[in-house]
A protein has these predicted regions:
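Hydrophobic alpha-helical connector segments
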Residues: 75-121, 137-140, 144-147
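Amphipathic alpha-helical segments used for helix-helix packing
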Residues: 67, 95-115, 125, 156-160, ...
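C-terminal all-alpha effector/ligand-binding and dimerization domain
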Residues: 197, 201-217
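N-terminal intrinsically disordered/low-complexity leader segments
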Residues: 1-15, 185-195, 224
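Short, basic, alpha-helical segments at the C-terminal edge of helix-turn-helix-like DNA-binding modules
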Residues: 69-73
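Helix-turn-helix
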Residues: 19, 23, 27-61, 65
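Hydrophobic alpha-helical bundle segments that form small-molecule/ligand-binding pockets
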Residues: 122-144, 148-150, 154-176, 190, ...
């Protein structure tokens, strides 16, 4: 008599803190931080919402963990003879990470929590690279904030443009149809320059970054 084969049980990936964080980041990347809820996250993971609270007692704890994971993606500075190249790579890496996770900048700027461990490590590494390049403590302080403001400021400035260009690719053309060229010729020229840029073009970021690095190098050299 043939024995009936038992149906194979579905093998689920065990729930873990790392798995919850990855799923939460993917959800926020896709729909923004506003789309994140414990209920929706549990649904995506195929678990009960209450099981998430074993890893994160509050939603704020979850978003703190997400921010920590995001800052952990940022490149730390090397220690080559070229301090500018080392800092440049880190700044570009930080910008790319924040653009990849557009929701993160909102959380960084809300002032709700102390910076995460990964962010503190990144800050310490940048400060240390500036000090090892010969900057005084005071100049390192100002240099770090100039770089940080440029990174975060650029991301905050460019994200709405990326969203608009994706949702309404012909918006600039329609805007320029009725633009008062005679009254505002310089602004019209400026808008045309923007219109010619490719979505996601980062030359603006790198232009400003080079100005900052050039200025810092002059200050460093004059203080030597």
């Amino acid at each position: 008599m043939a024995t009936q084969a038992r149906p194979k049980r579905e093998i689920r990936t065990p729930l873990s803190r790392e798995r919850v964080l990855r799923a939460a980041i993917e959800l926020a990347d896709e729909g923004g931080i506003e789309s994140l809820s414990m209920r929706r996250l549990a649904q995506d993971l195929g678990v009960e919402a209450m099981s998430l609270y074993y890893y994160f007692a509050r939603k704020d704890d979850l978003t703190d963990g997400m921010l920590d994971a995001v800052f952990g993606e940022m490149e730390l500075p090397a220690s080559t003879p070229d301090w500018r190249a080392d800092v440049r790579r880190c700044a570009i890496s930080a910008k790319e990470v924040l653009l990849r996770h557009a929701w993160a900048t909102k959380l960084v700027g809300n002032g709700r929590t102390f910076p995460s461990q990964a962010r503190l490590v990144w800050m310490n590494a940048i400060l240390g690279r500036l000090r090892s390049a010969g900057f005084s403590p005071n100049m390192t302080h100002h240099a770090y904030h100039a770089l940080d403001s440029h990174i975060v400021g650029f991301v905050l400035w460019v994200l709405p443009y990326l969203a608009i260009s994706k949702a309404q690719p012909d918006l600039t053309a329609r805007f320029l149809e009725d633009f008062p060229y005679a009254e505002l010729p310089h602004l019209a020229e400026h808008i045309r320059e923007h219109a010619e840029e490719r979505p996601g073009d980062t030359s603006e970021f790198e232009f400003g970054l080079e100005l900052i690095l050039d200025g810092l190098e002059r200050l460093r050299a004059s203080a030597a």
